[in-house]
Amino acid sequence: ILEFTRQGIPVERLVAFLDNLMDNPSKRAVDELYGFLESSGLPITDDGHFLAYKAVTKDYMDKHSRSISNAVGEVISMPRNQVSDNKEDTCSHGLHFAAHEYASGFGRGDDRMMVMKINPRDVVSIPSDYNNQKGRCCEYTVHAEVCSCLRVDSQRRRPTGVQLCEG
């Protein structure tokens, strides 16, 4: 934050992010989240939340149980103590979010790619075996639907711009 301030880069969203992060009761999640965001290239919003991705079915249902609607505007939550906080449990209980590259690997045919808005306080774990590409949380808001990837950074294989669906 100090370096950004010296360079004249606005820091308000980072300050808001840190405020939200400090509300997270998990030291491990606090320690791991920024590294996840940095390596995934995921943005921090003005209110200090962050955006991540999730592949869902064509009718906006989750791909695992096909019982949770992930339509834009939905707030999805579960009790925090039912989310696996063990980062060594790579596929386990919880609400999943991911970097674009990882999430796009789950999309098939007419599946949809959604943008999730997540408060840092709700992050429970960042699994250890996916190079900081996915995580688990206890709550997220479905923020938008991705209609297309505008550009992909060929070296880092991540989108540098996405087009969100209108409506």
Identify the role of each PLM range.
Residues 2-90:
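ADP-ribose/NAD+-binding catalytic cleft of ART/PARP-like enzymes
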Residues 1, 141-154, 159-166:
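Acidic, proline/serine/threonine- and glycine-rich low-complexity intrinsically disordered segments
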Residues 79-152:
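ADP-ribosyltransferase catalytic core
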Residues 69-71, 132-136, 158-160:
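Generic alpha-helical propensity signal that fires on short helical segments
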